[in-house]
Amino acid sequence: FENIVVTTPQTNATIVAERSGIMSKKVNASIIGVIENMSYMEAKGNKIYPFGKDGGKDLSKKLDVPFIGAIPLLEDITVSSEGSNLFAFKENPEFENIISIANEILKFQPKKKPIDLKIN
């Protein structure tokens, strides 16, 4: 299995995410990398870090895996994802960042065939 560890920048969140990464390694699941969600927000052109800074980067170093990227706290993302249309905010400058993260994930090919789930 391959995993992606997702965290927010807060220390407590990275501690929990680190446990997830350690458990993945114990069961021989590879970790593709770390993504930091709700990394920052922008106000008047300035980045604000309400939950701290670089928690995801620090975690990727601890787990010795790549840091895939940081996703900002952005209302456009929330609104478009709740409406099941992630491309609704493609005019936002952060859209390219999300596409870049997705492309990094797509570079990894599964080491095993995915489990074939049957739904009715």
Where are the language model's segments positioned?
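C-terminal lobe/tail of nucleotide-utilizing enzymes
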Residues: 21-120
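Short, catalytically relevant binding-site loops at active-site mouths
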Residues: 10-13, 39-41
